[in-house]
């Protein structure tokens, strides 16, 4: 983000990865709405979406494949002397830290109000994912060998680091 950006937060823009539990998308939107309302009350500038998407399984998003809610927010680049905005105001470093602080406190308040419901959704989602009715039930993936043994070993190492079950034949 450049200095003339403001503050970016969820929800992400389309496309959304279709392998993410719908409850996580629901909770992400609830957290984003509460955070937006906190910024609106203070008349702070922010935006959602733009380059922030949840298709690529990396950055703040990877945790959602493990059942956790990933929350991304970023403050524009800031110098210790502040940044002059296009309309002439100066945004100080102190203000940018305040944005991060308010976002964090708002996220904690949302979590406090919704902890039991979030745990229930998490538990129900985990049970479904390993059930015989899951869209992931009875799936097997085969990786055919090639002459590039290093690439195959690297993939195996990464999958095993994530506690995935592998059968070597």
Question: Where are the predicted features?
Answer:
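Active-site lining segments that contact anionic ligands and/or coordinate catalytic metals
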Residues: 67-70, 136-140, 161
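Functional cores that coordinate and move charged inorganic groups
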Residues: 1-93
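Divalent metal-coordination and catalytic microenvironments
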Residues: 73, 104, 159
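Short hydrophobic beta-strand segments
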Residues: 133-150
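Generic recognition of flexible, low-complexity loop/linker segments
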Residues: 58-62, 125-131, 144, 154-155
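Long hydrophobic segments that form regular secondary structure
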Residues: 91-94, 107-110, 146-161
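Catalytic cores of secreted or luminal carbohydrate-active enzymes
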Residues: 76-78, 82-134
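Conserved small/polar residues in nucleotide/adenosyl-binding loops
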Residues: 167-169
């Amino acid at each position: 983000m450049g200095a003339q950006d403001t503050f970016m937060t969820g929800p992400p823009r389309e496309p959304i990865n279709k392998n993410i539990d719908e409850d996580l998308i629901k909770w992400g939107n609830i957290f984003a709405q509460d955070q937006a309302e906190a910024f609106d009350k203070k008349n702070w500038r922010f935006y959602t979406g733009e380059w922030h998407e949840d298709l690529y399984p990396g950055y703040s998003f990877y945790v959602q494949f493990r059942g956790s809610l990933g929350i991304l927010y970023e403050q524009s680049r800031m110098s210790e002397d502040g940044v002059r905005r296009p309309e002439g105001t100066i945004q100080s470093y102190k203000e940018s830290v305040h944005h991060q602080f308010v976002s964090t406190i708002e996220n904690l308040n949302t979590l406090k109000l919704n902890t039991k419901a979030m745990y229930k959704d998490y538990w129900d989602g985990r049970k479904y994912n390993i059930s015989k009715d899951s869209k992931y039930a009875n799936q097997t993936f085969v990786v055919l060998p090639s002459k590039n043994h290093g690439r195959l070993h690297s993939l195996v190492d990464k999958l095993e680091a994530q506690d995935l079950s592998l059968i070597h034949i």
